Amino acid sequence: MSAILDIHARQIFDSRGNPTVEVDVYTENGIMGRAAVPSGASTGEHEAVELRDGGKDFMGKGVQKAVDNVNGEIADHLLGFSVFEQNLIDQTMIDLDGTPNKSKLGANAILGVSLAVAKAAANELNMPLYRYVGGVSANTLPVPMMNIINGGSHSDAPIAFQEFMIMPVMADSFSHALKMGTEIFHNLKNVLHDRGLSTAVGDEGGFAPTLDGTEDALDTILKAIEKAGYKPGKEVMIALDCAAAEFFVDGKYDYTKFEGDKGKVRTSEEQADYLAELASKYPIISIEDGMDENDWEGWKAVTDKIGDKVQLVGDDLFVTNVERLGRGIKESIANSILIKVNQIGTLTETIAAVNMAHNAGYTSVMSHRSGETEDNTIADLAVALNTGQIKTGSASRSDRMAKYNQLLRIEEELGDVAFYPQDKAFKIK
């Protein structure tokens, strides 16, 4: 029955040098599954709780409590379970925690076990993870959202928006898309260098130059796309992550928080108008978190304005949570959900969120966190769940490239069955 023989967690380090949780699950057949848990810098207030130790060690960011919860209470309850009982295992941990946001055991403890169990099960069957989770229909390679300029909380650049991304929507295949993305990334480096700007990279591998503002960042990206020999608005589109919750202050969108005196302060309606203006002026296909996570009226305004022609992605808004997504669907707010496994804390709940989104006609985007590891599970999950899009950083830093490289392997393994959706990944006009 492939029973779980042992569960062992340890403290390792993420791409920012902060502690995180890694879990090994061993079966009675000697098979092992391993998963490392990512961590975010800008986190939604409705996310599942990442348990940290506090105190002086690691500036309060240690995860020994979460590790002890895995090695103690969680292991005590799960030893003897079949690794193929994913739903039962996940539900057992949810019940064991007993809180609505996994604050007792920690979402980082629970997720590490959940993903390691799935990997052990796939290894038991000598099957790739994407095939084990997704079955025979798992054949869609995602269109990459490549974060090439970082702003907001991810860099020291004086720009409020957190991420400026490129999407090679008309590539012939995933490998072709990655070629296009890397060429644009390297051309962007040259464009920045020629302007005497910094080419140091931020948390997610994108550049963090001292640009003059949002439009300067967009114009610079257009120049890099053209310099690489591609057509913006046709072969390559732009995606934004505004992370608006990071500069939503006292009911207004206060750009001065990141942009200083030249930044504007906008109401919800003005913010919606500004996003619509940018979308009409530039080849923007996707905007994530253009409004604060609690500004449902603002979200409704921007959805009504541009939701028919721009993908509007809820990250902090939905936090991979079916209850919040359900409200969004009911009120026709946004049209896409960002999927972050550590926002909700189990594989079962992640799958439920993707299924709910797709059944309602919303798109889904599999996503990394700014604090990542060499773990490439989300690459397999993007294919397994046919999300059609993945957001996993720039074309630099091995913690980001690990996911892209895994997708190259999956595409090669799938062969002729591999499907790259191009612009059909978006359900907009």
Swiss-Prot record:
The active site is at E204 (proton donor), K340 (proton acceptor). Pathway: Carbohydrate degradation; glycolysis; pyruvate from D-glyceraldehyde 3-phosphate: step 4/5. One of its GO terms (cellular component) is extracellular region. One of its GO terms (biological process) is glycolytic process. SMART domains: Enolase_C, Enolase_N. Binds a second Mg(2+) ion via substrate during catalysis. It is found in: Cytoplasm; Secreted; Cell surface. Its main location: cytoplasm. The keyword Lyase applies. Its EC number is 4.2.1.11. Its cofactor is Mg(2+). It comes from the Bacteria. Mg(2+) binds at D241, E288, D315. Belongs to the enolase family. This is Enolase.
